[in-house]
């Protein structure tokens, strides 16, 4: 009986941190969307680590806060109304996680179209806050 109880406690100990990480990461994603929709691209960039790398489709890698801010500002001229849906968060330890999700957004112009895709983010905990360390996405389902 003692082994069963210890086993249950062990499994709960593994599940609880992962679900807490997911909730914290989803909260940062909500903040990312809020900043983007307000046009606060310095705010968006502040959610990335200082040495973050963004790998946008069909473009060169983007590194560092200033370049990430400029990239999102330029992107917002063409698209808006982003929606992020976390599908899975895998803990990589107490200060790192991997997120897989999907997104949708709308193109700007006379005939806006919805664009959908998928993404992977590697998260790092910096000073108690989750930050995007590597961010890659592409379109399609």
PLM segments and residue spans:
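Solvent-exposed loop/turn segments at secondary-structure junctions
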Residues: 41, 51, 59-61, 105-106, ...
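Surface-exposed, charged secondary-structure patches
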Residues: 69-111
């Amino acid at each position: 009986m003692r082994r069963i109880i210890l086993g249950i406690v062990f499994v709960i100990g593994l599940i609880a941190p992962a679900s807490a990480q997911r909730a914290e990461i989803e909260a940062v994603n909500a903040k990312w969307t809020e900043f983007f929709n307000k046009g606060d691209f310095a705010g968006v960039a502040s959610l990335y680590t200082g040495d973050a790398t963004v790998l946008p489709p069909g473009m060169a890698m983007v590194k560092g806060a200033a370049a990430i801010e400029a990239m999102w500002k330029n992107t917002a001229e063409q698209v808006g109304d982003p929606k992020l849906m976390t599908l899975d968060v895998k803990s990589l330890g107490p200060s790192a996680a991997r997120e897989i999700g999907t997104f949708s957004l709308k193109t700007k112009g006379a005939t806006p179209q919805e664009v959908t895709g998928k993404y992977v983010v590697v998260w790092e905990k910096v000073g108690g806050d989750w930050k995007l360390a590597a961010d890659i996405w592409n379109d399609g389902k």
